[in-house]
């Protein structure tokens, strides 16, 4: 990977996009961004509050603007929100401006990784979280597949080993 190409991480919540993204950026000496953190920084409020006040559609529009802006930078690693792929325009930004890495994980791992996280506005009713995650997977997985240049399973590996695996795969394309 001679020149520093943008790397965009997509996948469901709990796949490890932020954690793996930080590892990748350190190992490749690239700047790291997290679209959710950027939205929080710009609004001065957490994602749950933005969802409550603006609804999911308002949040997604903010997210689309942030991703449009961030993907024009050079040599970055970007962890996107799980639902960022809902809009075609956002998928186009990602697929045309860098290498898209789809981090795959199981519903079981998602449940385990997100169960104590209060910053997940779509998972605020523990009784129905499995069904919510299954519905989101049904809706979003085709979009992740559509734009993925690389697919990596994250279930039983450390963030560091997933990052090394991604780097190895990047060298092949």
From Swiss-Prot:
It is found in: Cytoplasm. Signal peptide: none annotated. Keywords: Amino-acid biosynthesis, Aromatic amino acid biosynthesis, ATP-binding, Cytoplasm, Kinase, Magnesium, Metal-binding, Nucleotide-binding, Transferase. ATP binds at residues 14-19, 120, 157. PROSITE patterns: SHIKIMATE_KINASE. The keyword Nucleotide-binding applies. The keyword Kinase applies. One of its GO terms (molecular function) is shikimate kinase activity. Its cofactor is Mg(2+). It catalyses: shikimate + ATP = 3-phosphoshikimate + ADP + H(+). Mg(2+) binds at residue 18. One of its GO terms (cellular component) is cytosol. SUPFAM superfamilies: P-loop containing nucleoside triphosphate hydrolases (SSF52540). GO terms for biological process: amino acid biosynthetic process; aromatic amino acid family biosynthetic process; chorismate biosynthetic process. Pathway: Metabolic intermediate biosynthesis; chorismate biosynthesis; chorismate from D-erythrose 4-phosphate and phosphoenolpyruvate: step 5/7. Its main location: cytoplasm. It comes from the Bacteria. Binds 1 Mg(2+) ion per subunit. Its EC number is 2.7.1.71. Substrate binds at residues 36, 60, 82, 140. Pfam families: SKI (PF01202). Catalyzes the specific phosphorylation of the 3-hydroxyl group of shikimic acid using ATP as a cosubstrate. Belongs to the shikimate kinase family. HAMAP family: Shikimate_kinase. Monomer. This is Shikimate kinase. The lineage of its organism: Bacteria, Pseudomonadati, Pseudomonadota, Gammaproteobacteria, Enterobacterales.
